[in-house]
């Protein structure tokens, strides 16, 4: 079970809304989101309703300003509680449809290019656990939530290009 409280203003001020499960449309409850407090679980915030648009990964902790979660604006229109898994395994492929060179990860990787000579990933398989893929190294840039399953091309995980700089396991430390 997870719990997140979203606040309209910075510093946990203004109108707020508490969630303990997935919420596809926050618009009736909040006009904007400038701060958040994650009491338990790991969450993905989405810029648009129905889990679309830019994504922002939050772990347990206080985020007094939307820039602390790398938010580009105060628009948060949906949120998802990410299921926890004990083990993690992901395979990344150089080309679409699981072709070309492959590398498998079971741990976080802050710089993909240090481990895999490519900085573009065109397909992947999430075999165990949930992962967050980042467009840039050191867990920066656009973020993409990956749940167990097959992703035959980068558009399948919502990306507009194949650039991948880092990846992180979703682990709830609570």
From Swiss-Prot:
Residue ranges of every copy of the Beta/gamma crystallin 'Greek key' domain listed in the record: 2-40, 41-83, 88-128, 129-171
InterPro entries reported in the protein's UniProt record: Beta/Gamma-Crystallin (IPR050252), Beta/gamma_crystallin (IPR001064), G_crystallin-like (IPR011024)
GO biological processes: cellular response to reactive oxygen species; lens development in camera-type eye; lens fiber cell differentiation; visual perception
Effect of residue 36 to P: In CTRCT4; uncertain significance
Annotated stretches, region: Connecting peptide: 84-87
Superkingdom per UniProt: Eukaryota
A GO molecular-function annotation: structural constituent of eye lens
Record keywords: Cataract, Disease variant, Eye lens protein, Repeat, Sensory transduction, Vision
Mutation effect (residue 37 to S): In CTRCT4; very low solubility; crystallizes spontaneously
GO cellular component: cytoplasm; nucleus
Medical condition linked: Cataract 4, multiple types: An opacification of the crystalline lens of the eye that frequently results in visual impairment or blindness. Opacities vary in morphology, are often confined to a portion of the lens, and may be static or progressive. CTRCT4 includes crystalline aculeiform, congenital cerulean and non-nuclear polymorphic cataracts, among others. Crystalline aculeiform cataract is characterized by fiberglass-like or needle-like crystals projecting in different directions, through or close to the axial region of the lens.
Function recorded in the entry: Crystallins are the dominant structural components of the vertebrate eye lens.
Entry text on domains: Has a two-domain beta-structure, folded into four very similar Greek key motifs.
Family the UniProt entry places it in: Belongs to the beta/gamma-crystallin family.
Oligomeric and partner information: Monomer.
Descriptive protein name: Gamma-crystallin D
Organism lineage string: Eukaryota, Metazoa, Chordata, Craniata, Vertebrata
């Amino acid at each position: 079970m997870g719990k997140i409280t979203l606040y309209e203003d910075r510093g946990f001020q203004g109108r707020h809304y508490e969630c303990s499960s997935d919420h596809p449309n926050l618009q009736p409850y909040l006009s904007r989101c400038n701060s958040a407090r994650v009491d338990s679980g790991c969450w993905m915030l989405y810029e648009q309703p129905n889990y679309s648009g830019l994504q922002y990964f939050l772990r347990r902790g206080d985020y007094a300003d939307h820039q602390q979660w790398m938010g580009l604006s105060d628009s948060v229109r949906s949120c998802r509680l990410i299921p926890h898994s004990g083990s993690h395994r992901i395979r990344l492929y150089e080309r679409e449809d699981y072709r070309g060179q492959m590398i498998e990860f079971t741990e976080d990787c802050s710089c993909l290019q240090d481990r895999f000579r490519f900085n573009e990933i065109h397909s992947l398989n999430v075999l165990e656990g949930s992962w967050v893929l980042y467009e840039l190294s050191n867990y920066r840039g656009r973020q993409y939530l990956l749940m167990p399953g097959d992703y035959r091309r980068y558009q399948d995980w919502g990306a507009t290009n194949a650039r991948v700089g880092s990846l992180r396991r979703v682990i709830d430390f609570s």
